[in-house]
Structures are given as C-alpha cells and as structure tokens.
Amino acid sequence: MSRFHSLLAFVVASLTAVAHAGIGPVADLTITNAAVSPDGFSRQAVVVNGGTPGPLITGNMGDRFQLNVIDNLTNHTMVKSTSIHWHGFFQKGTNWADGPAFINQCPISSGHSFLYDFQVPDQAGTFWYHSHLSTQYCDGLRGPFVVYDPNDPAADLYDVDNDDTVITLVDWYHVAAKLGPAFPLGADATLINGKGRSPSTTTADLSVISVTPGKRYRFRLVSLSCDPNYTFSIDGHNMTIIETDSINTAPLVVDSIQIFAAQRYSFVLEANQAVDNYWIRANPNFGNVGFTGGINSAILRYDGAAAVEPTTTQTTSTAPLNEVNLHPLVTTAVPGSPVAGGVDLAINMAFNFNGTNFFINGTSFTPPTVPVLLQIISGAQNAQDLLPSGSVYSLPSNADIEISFPATAAAPGAPHPFHLHGHAFAVVRSAGSTVYNYDNPIFRDVVSTGTPAAGDNVTIRFRTDNPGPWFLHCHIDFHLEAGFAVVFAEDIPDVASANPVPQAWSDLCPTYDALDPSDQ
C-alpha cells in the first residue's frame, strides 16, 4: 500500500509539474471566454487553455510546430472569431501561417479549428503569440513562446533557463477593448507573470520569482503589451542583456530596460545580493504610473527569505538600456552599402492622424475582405491591383530595402513601436540618435520610432529573401486598429509557388464569410 501511495504521490507531483510546464511543439490551443481576475477585479476575457496570459509554448531550433487553434468563443461583447500570429518567426514558405487576419488568412470562425503548421529551421530565442484580429489580444489572447538552441552560444553565462525564468508584462483593462475608448488613457493594471494590482485592488496577489543565492538566471522578458512601454528594473540588481528579439546579442550590462510593445530581451541576473525580497518594477510610460500600493510590481525572492513584501527602494538608473549600445553577438552584414540611401529601394513612412485614424503616406489601413495572400494567389500581380488601395507596397526579390520613420507631432502617442513580419531588420538609426551605423547595428523585429522632440528619424534595413505579403505596423494595438499599417508584398511573382497553402486554409474564408456579422 505504501508503494501505491508513493506512486500516487509521484503521479500527482508529475501532473502538477506538467500544469506549469510549457506546451509544444505539437499542441492544442483552445480559445474560450472566461471570467478572470488577475488583479483582483473580475471580468470576462479571452483565454487560452483556460488562462491569460496563455501557456508558454516551447520547442527547439529545428522543430516543426503544429499548433491547433480551437475557437470556442461565445461572448458577443468581444470578437468571436480569431487568428493567431506567432511573433518573430520568419514563416519562410508558410506565409499562410503568419496569422494577421485579412493579410495572411481569413479568421477562424467560432466552432471551428485551424492547424498552424510551420518549421523553425534557423531561429531560436524568445518570441510570443497573440491574436491578430482587431484588438482581441488586449482582452487576453496573448502568451510567451520560447525556442531553445541546444548549442546556445551564451550557455556558459547562466545556470538556469526554464519555464520559471520567463517574465511577461501585460497591460490589463477592466473593460473589454470593443466596449472601451478607442484610445485608452492607460491600463487599469500592469500584470507581471499574470498577476498585478490596480490602484483600487492593492491587496491582490503579486507574482513571486524565486532565486537561489549564487545562481545565474537567464530571464526572458517579454512585453505582451497592447499599448504602453515599460521601464523594467529589479532593485539592487544589474542585468546583462544577451538577446534582443530572438537575436543573440553581445553582453551588455544595464540597470533598467525600456521595453516597447512586442519587444523581448533575455538578460542574465546573478543572485549575488543578501537573502531578502526585492521589488521587480515595470513602470508604464503613462496611465497608473509609480508603485504606490504595489502596483506595477512583482517580487524577487531569494530562497530562505521570509514570505513578505520587499522593503527595498528604487535607486536612480545610472546604466539604462540604450539601443545604440546593442550589437549582434555575431557581426551580421547590413543590407546595402554603408552610405545614406545605399539600397535598391528606400521608402519613407510619413505619419499622420486625423483625430480618428492614423495614416501612412496619406492612406489609413482598412482590412480588405479578401486576404492579401489570397488576392495574390488568385492572380493579382501588381501592387496597384491589391487591396486595400494605397496600403500595399510591392517589393522586388533579393533587394536591399531601407525604411525610414520620421517622428512627427502629426502622429500623437509616440513613441510608436513598429513591427515588420517575416524578417529581422538592421536598426541603422535608433531613436534618440542621429548616427547611422552600417557596421554593427542590432537586428530585431520591433523598433521604437522615437519622438518628434528628439528629431528622430529611425531607419531600418532588410533584404527581400522571403516571398509573401508581410504586415508592417505600429504594435500599439489601438493604433493598428485605427489604420496605422501597410503591407509589403514581397516578390509577388513567386508568392504562390513559395507558399503552398493547405486545403484547411482555403476553407477559412468561405466559412467566415458565411457568418452573420454578429457572429464574427
């Protein structure tokens, strides 16, 4: 009998461990509505496998990911269809699996499922996933995604890198996105690893991250934000950045990190302070700022410390992260020649806003009824033939492209973080800098486009080696919903042959188009 009880205890312990473990590379993601109260306030949300943020998805470089998304949404106050983007993955040959609704697919209808099936042959690092339909991810459909490299070149810099060292940042709202203002004046709460407090719920539980003295931890910081950027710090501790948006990075020691929506950093933290509790801080750039009552906070707890809230104080940051100091671990050639305009095609993105919608080069993005990928597969071969008119830019194959984003007071809400799908790009001019670096700039997939006050003209470069329509947009989701986006139709003649689509993908549009608008 004792052997049976031992076995039972082992099984229970194993199940408990699995409940907190990452899923993947083959997994079901069931999307439902549920009441959640991550900050002590209960509201209906969009959850993944029962929770928000959704479960950590993990795998190894070289894996084939087969992620079956099952849409069981029923709440009419939120979008009932869905579509999921796997943020940071190049999707080479699987443009149809990238996820943005009406760019790469029709949404998945409620009561239906869709299998995202893609290879990750040459990428590793920290990614995430989120709804790419309307503002649905703000209501909860967002989660972290890590691809491990068995031959990680930074492996000797840390001792621990597991599910428990992923740190997610979430802006949380008490009102569903479609019921609230078009441009909220700040989140109600900041959630760190799914827990937090609002100014009216200061007794809610906070996340605790445990460390063992003397160990070195690779923390993977992921901004799942819909809007604010955060200044992240841990009292009494420096952080050594080793990864930027899944790009291995030359080690850089900082004491605070400004992280914009959708960006990721890995940093090494050495647990070398006195055994105690230390505040983890993620201060948003607007809204409920500061730390009164434990808002915008979590707890770093050394093994052996009492289970109490920290009493540590924040010191002035003397080594904040500056993007110009980030460099790839392995120097990577910058596309084009090392002079201004030394590319095959340079495009300037002129921003504007009319009080309701954002514009790029005079056009506000409105989702087409037929996905751009389907338009191309169906025979449209020129940008002028692709909808939405004025928002699709044709890019030639195997060309060096430069994009500039001059900051302007005409587009309020800066700094706007811009994300390019299907690529990592070289940031040849960063926000806050007037220097053009063609030598060793960081590569990443989300960049702050800075502020007009700084006279910023953030400039990026990439090479067109990945046929397909790829979204370029502000990752403040409320701004994207207001049209702050364009589509790059890359190598149009080769899109169909390079991206064979499964029958299930072809079935998405007829199913979605048959829905009553109230069920979409």
Curated annotation (Swiss-Prot):
Report which reactions are catalysed by this protein. 4 hydroquinone + O2 = 4 benzosemiquinone + 2 H2O
| Positions of disulphide bridges | C106-C509, C138-C226
- Localization of this protein: Secreted
Q: What InterPro entries does this protein map onto?
A: Cu-oxidase-like_N, Cu-oxidase_2nd, Cu-oxidase_C, Cu-oxidase_fam, Cu_oxidase_CS, Cupredoxin
Record note on cofactor: Binds 4 Cu cations per monomer.
| Sequence positions that bind Cu cation 3 | H132, H421, H473
> What is the name of this protein?
Laccase-1
The record lists Cu cation 2 as bound by H87, H130, H475
Glycosylated residues (UniProt)? N72, N75, N229, N238, N354, N361
- List UniProt keywords, sorted A-Z: Copper, Disulfide bond, Glycoprotein, Lignin degradation, Metal-binding, Oxidoreductase, Repeat, Secreted, Signal
Pfam annotation, one family: Cu-oxidase_2
Which residues of the sequence carry a binding annotation for Cu cation 1? Answer: H85, H419
* Family according to the record: Belongs to the multicopper oxidase family.
What is an annotated GO biological process for this record, any one?
A: lignin catabolic process
* Coiled-coil residue windows: none
Q: What is its EC number?
A: 1.10.3.2
**Enzyme class, UniProt record, top EC level:** oxidoreductase
Function according to Swiss-Prot or TrEMBL: Lignin degradation and detoxification of lignin-derived products.
Record text on subunit structure and interactions? Homodimer.
Question: Mind listing the GO molecular function terms for this protein?
Answer: copper ion binding; hydroquinone:oxygen oxidoreductase activity
What is the organism field in this record? Trametes villosa (White-rot fungus)
